[in-house]
Amino acid sequence: MQLKEAEKINNNMYFAYKKWRMRLKNFRYSFKLVYAATKFYTWISIFPALIGSVMPFATVYLIKLIVDETIYAAGSPDKMLAFKKVLLLIIIAGICFLLNHLSNVFDAYIKDVREQKFFDYIFNRIHEKTTKIDIENFDDDKYYDLFSRAFENAQSRPLYVVNQTITVVQNSIALLSLAVLLLTLHNAVFLVLLLATVPLGLVKLKFSKALYKWVRDNTRKTRKTWYINDLLTREEFSMEIRLFVLSDYLIRLFKKLRTEIREGYLKIYKKRMLFEVLAQFMAAFAVFGAFGVISYNTVIGVLTVGSLTMYLIAIERGVSLFNLIFKDLSNIYADSLYVEYLEVFLDIPIKEKDRETNQKFPNPMHKGIVFKDVSFKYPSSKRSVLQNVNINIEAGKTVALVGANGSGKTTLIKLLSKFYAPDSGKILIDGQDLKDIQLSSVRENITALLQNFAHYNFTAAENIKFGKAGKDEGIEKIIDAAKKAQIDGLIQSLPYGYDTVLGKIYNDSEELSIGQWQKMGLARALYKDSQIVIMDEPTAALDAQAEYELFSIFKEVLKDKTVLLISHRFSTVQMADYIYVLDNESIAEQGTHKDLLKKNGLYAKMYNKQALYYQQ
């Protein structure tokens, strides 16, 4: 039994040791991040901290001298001569006061600069991570929880840890100097300070940990309130919410979740408040007991009035400094817990990096693209999406992928774009295995026009230039792409031409229709001038006339490109040189439009259903 108890104690000690090692690791990581962002300002912040650390002692001692010398001068036969000494002390105190306040102003400026630089640095790190991590992370609910904790709760915490650590060091030096002063009065005075402050500090530490655990456990609920807030406030949901009269339901749901969050949060704070009140009673008893002892010693002549003033102020300042130190230590502890989320997020491994290879994407392609026995399932799913799929896309040809939703059409595009790698099989580009070709080279040679393409609230020129944002090829190339996409005339008619901001974000910006945005997306794809053009339901949101006009443009401007087309509209699919029909995770049929109709199989069945719908 004793052996088990000893083992339990050892285990508890081991886990406690591991926890503190983790806190220390988070603490070091905070300094590493802040120093990387603000080297110069981190070093220079030491100077105001040093000034602030010696000022409490200097101020308290100067007040003692001023009081004693003033009392002496009042009873001196040569009052003016005695007052000169008082005046000198007042001037020194004034200089210290001014120096302290100038130091505080300088320190506030340093902190503001460091905060701005650090936030820019952290945002850059987060943006680099979110745009480079493997796209499979976006299929994982745990990623969103981690992102929420890192972005909403942790992004500013490393800076707080560093700022509060500097403040703790500053206040500790100041407290040490006051403690030396108080020990000249009595050895027990310092114990009075501990009795007045330690219980309150322990309360803050305990409830910092409780609050952290509560925030962690309620991350998903908090995320849901943010999502509902987006539904209620963003323009893209506004019409549907009004048409379905969803607002009352969503507002009730938001209030319910917020009430649960608020009550859970306040429950912790109410309990903390109760413990803090008890700790404050203890502090008041200790401090005012010490005041009584000091006053008694002054009455019986042991202390001067100046010493009385000095010790009273020193005790008050000492208690205040102790409370600040414990408060900052509690905050450092809490903030360091959150820093771990930021570290884990920023350290998410990036798999889709360029391999150590010199192999570039063949340019120009001669043979084309071959999917050879490709099988794949998403990392977050147990269901296979593709099984032994074989597809041949000749260079310069347009190939269409047809099938029901979820049949794997878009997955093939993701595999070709190296967002994912096949579980088995190969994707060959002119005979080269895609996995051996540099990722950057693959992305340079593929462009896309998607169903849910982005509407960038930038200028018309920038919207097109984003096709190849890393290279500035001049306005002529932008205009050329716009002309090919037949959007140049519209852009020229806008108030500021190519410098007009698109969308609804500003008062002087201009919104486009869906068809016009689609042409803008086409211009962006043409500006990139890649060999392979992916078109994933590019006309799904267009009416028949707009679709016809857009595909007339497609036929003309993409005639020399290798095009991979996904569409449910057979009027669109007919433009393809060859068609693959996907069903049950594999290729069910393949051939030209005419061949597939003659087979009278799955393709013909889907085509006839759609044709009947249009006839009716």
Question: Where are the regions that the model predicts?
Answer:
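Membrane-integrated ABC transporters
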Residues: 1-56, 75-89, 107-111, 128, ...
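Short intracellular "coupling" helices and adjacent cytoplasmic loop segments at the cytosolic face
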Residues: 7-16, 125-156, 218-252, 344-357, ...
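Juxtamembrane helix-loop junctions of ABC transporter transmembrane domains
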Residues: 16, 59-63, 97-139, 143, ...
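An intracellular "coupling" helix at the cytosolic face of ABC transporter transmembrane type-1 domains
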Residues: 36, 151-161, 213, 217-220, ...
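Transmembrane helix-loop-helix hairpins at lipid-water interfaces of multipass membrane proteins
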Residues: 42-106, 180-211, 285-292, 296-305, ...
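Conserved catalytic Walker-motif region of ABC-type ATPase nucleotide-binding domains
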Residues: 130, 254, 371-373
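Cytosolic ends of transmembrane helices, especially the final helix of ABC transmembrane type-1 domains
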Residues: 217, 246, 290, 311-347
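ABC-type nucleotide-binding domain
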Residues: 359-616
